[in-house]
Swiss-Prot record:
It comes from Caenorhabditis elegans. InterPro entries: HNF4-like_DBD, NHR-like_dom_sf, Nucl_hrmn_rcpt_lig-bd, Nuclear_hrmn_rcpt, Orphan_Nuclear_Rcpt, Znf_hrmn_rcpt, Znf_NHR/GATA. Gene3D superfamilies: Erythroid Transcription Factor GATA-1, subunit A, Retinoid X Receptor. The gene is nhr-31. Orphan nuclear receptor. SUPFAM superfamilies: Glucocorticoid receptor-like (DNA-binding domain) (SSF57716), Nuclear receptor ligand-binding domain (SSF48508). Residues 66-77 have a biased composition (Polar residues). Residues 79-154 bind DNA. Keywords: DNA-binding, Metal-binding, Nucleus, Receptor, Transcription, Transcription regulation, Zinc, Zinc-finger. It comes from the Eukaryota. It is found in: Nucleus. GO terms for biological process: embryo development ending in birth or egg hatching; post-embryonic animal morphogenesis; response to osmotic stress. Its main location: nucleus. This is Nuclear hormone receptor family member nhr-31. Residues 195-464 form the NR LBD domain.
């Protein structure tokens, strides 16, 4: 038996109802504090005098045989229950009975545009004791309970029309902060080590800056054409390109025009410069010459991977390749594309088949694409790197690879992380092969018309700068190179001055005079290469079952030098008189 000393009770028949949880206390009254004791309706019998003027009245509470009626959505004592977590004192919010906690959570989720993820099987317990354990399941429970997202009005947060607008503080690094907030909302990223998360946020910030470009055109920057700026000038005077970076977009809105291909190639070159400059700041051990070497090494593979990855993201059409100017090129090129060599060697067809199709199957996320870009750029075997730069770049590349493996392991916990990570790295040989085709096409473009376009940036990466100097000092007049078929091979292939042009001959059928006139060495020059490209096949292309003659043979000691001849005409006339023996 439990006796409670209270002051007033409202009577209604033989039953009583508690009107309020608080009571007015009179002097001399003993107060008993009851913490959330469920009140039961019962038969009340007085055990003493019932005078209201007495000091206190004792009541004996006995359970009643009548079962309490509980309405749907309400508790036993008449209070409404939250449809989401089951907490008491719920009111109508966004179409359902909900407590203030779930109402505020639902509103913050929609107005803040958060993105949650469940660490388990999307079936977490959501009650008033564990409702903060999993935000994803709590938000799903709000939707299932019937909360209407359209009922949330963000404009209700404003306190009224402000006569003086509030000044918002400018963030130091807005892109980095956005990625930080987005990654903090993802539960998988919280499992990454701190250093790995920082590196990932840095790479994502670099990608955002490269894609957005800049539109702050100033009069100071318009004085110099960006195409006339060299790679060294880009790294040493960074403000020279401010306002020259157009925004990059891969949405296939229209088909690209042939005259756009050069502009697209130039924009991708600037993007490669920005990527290299930002990554080398993280490495903090690379000078300008090393940066130039990295740009030359990564331009083609980075461009191929960018086009392929964004094509797999933005379209399911298997017959188009998206470019960075909101345009695309089809698999079957129109006839006008034959006028340029940018897309020769079946580059589009092979890229769609060998790279875009596997990327669609892998369905890469942005957190996987960006580290792959960094791995492509950070090539420690790039030609021209110093030994110190190779070591620094190799260390940074190892960190990025380890970060990529951690990301794959957290993003795809159901599948084998090691096999997916291996499939990602197996894309690199295909990218290298396709980038070789692209480099060859760019070499031809620079050889055929690159000098006329005046784009020194692409000419520095794919053209031989010594070619122009040799052309000026050469005795051959420039009109000889107007025919594309007679352009020097030196501009599209490595120097061959140290190679020997040797032809297979049958010693038994050759006289000593023939051997002396043929000569084993043909010094390389621009004029000779041009005439060789015009249609003359050198003797080295002929074959014979006999072995090559020994270089130390006495018959080859008296070779003919190009300087001893009176011009290339006399030299080639002697070569044309020599018989060529075919097998």
């Amino acid at each position: 038996m439990e006796q409670l000393d209270v002051e007033d009770w409202e009577y209604w028949g033989d039953e009583y109802l508690e009107e309020e949880p608080t009571y007015a206390i009179r002097p001399g009254t003993r107060v008993v504090k009851v913490e959330r004791v469920p009140m039961m309706r019962g038969d009340l019998r007085t055990s003493g005098a019932t005078s209201s003027s007495g000091p206190a009245t004792s009541y004996i509470i006995r359970p009643s045989d009548k079962q309490p009626t509980v309405s749907s959505g309400g508790s036993q004592n008449g209070d409404s229950v939250c449809a989401v977590c089951g907490d008491g004192i719920a009111k109508l919010h966004y179409g359902v009975l909900a407590c203030y906690g779930c109402k505020g959570f639902f509103r913050r989720t929609l107005t803040g545009k958060y993105r949650y993820a469940c660490r388990f099987s999307n079936n977490c317990i959501v009650d008033k004791f564990q409702r903060n354990s999993c935000r994803y399941c709590r938000f799903q429970r709000c939707i299932q309970a019937g909360m209407d997202p359209k009922a949330v009005r963000p404009d209700r947060d404003q306190t009224g029309k402000q006569k003086v607008p509030r000044i918002k503080k400018k963030q130091i690094d807005e892109e980095l902060l956005n990625h930080m907030m987005r990654l903090q909302g993802d539960d998988w990223s919280r499992k990454l080590p701190v250093e790995t998360r920082i590196l990932l946020m840095q790479l994502m910030s670099i990608e955002d800056k490269v894609v957005k470009g800049d539109n702050n055109m100033s009069a100071q920057n318009t004085a110099k054409d960006p195409k006339s700026i060299s790679l060294r000038e880009m790294f040493e005077s960074k403000p020279a390109l401010d306002g020259r970076r157009m925004e990059i977009g891969y949405e296939p809105f229209r088909m690209a025009r042939t005259e756009e291909l050069g502009v697209i190639a130039h924009r991708r070159a600037i993007a490669a410069v920005d990527w290299v400059d930002s990554l080398t700041e993280i490495a903090d051990a690379v000078d300008t010459e090393d940066k130039v070497a990295l740009v030359k090494s990564c331009y083609s593979p980075l461009t191929i991977f960018n086009f392929s990855a964004r094509t797999a993201q933005n379209t399911k059409n298997p017959d188009i390749l998206c470019l960075c100017s909101h345009s695309f090129v089809p698999r079957r090129l129109p006839p006008e594309f034959n006028e340029t060599n940018h897309l020769s060697n079946f580059l589009i067809d092979r890229t769609l088949n060998e790279l875009v199709a596997p990327l669609r199957k892998l369905n890469l996320k942005e957190e996987e694409i960006v580290p792959l870009k960094a791995i492509i750029i950070l090539n420690p075997n790039a030609k021209g790197l110093s030994e110190h730069a190779r070591h620094a770049i190799s260390e940074l590349r190892d960190k990025v690879q380890d970060m990529l493996f951690q990301i794959v392991k957290e993003l795809h916990p159901i599948y084998s992380a090691s096999s997916r990570f291996g499939n990602l790295l197996l894309l690199l040989p295909t990218i290298t092969t396709l980038s070789g085709l692209m480099s060859e096409n760019m070499h031809f473009c620079q050889a055929l018309g690159g000098r006329a376009s005046g784009d020194n940036l692409l000419a520095e990466m794919f053209g031989d700068r010594t070619f122009d100097d040799q052309l000026i000092s050469s005795s051959i007049s420039p009109p000889l190179f107007e025919n594309p078929a007679e352009i020097c091979l030196e501009s599209i292939s490595p120097p061959m001055s140290d190679r020997r042009f040797v032809r297979r001959v049958d010693v038994a059928t050759q006289t000593n005079d023939d051997l002396l006139s043929s000569g084993p060495y043909l010094p390389h020059s621009n004029s000779c290469s041009s005439m060789l490209n015009a249609g003359y096949s050198p003797p080295m292309l002929s074959t014979s079952p006999f072995p090559l003659l020994d270089d130390n043979d006495s018959a080859f000691q008296n070779d003919i030098s190009l300087t001893e001849l009176n011009g290339c005409e006399e030299f080639f006339s002697q070569l044309m008189d020599q018989p060529i023996i075919d097998s």
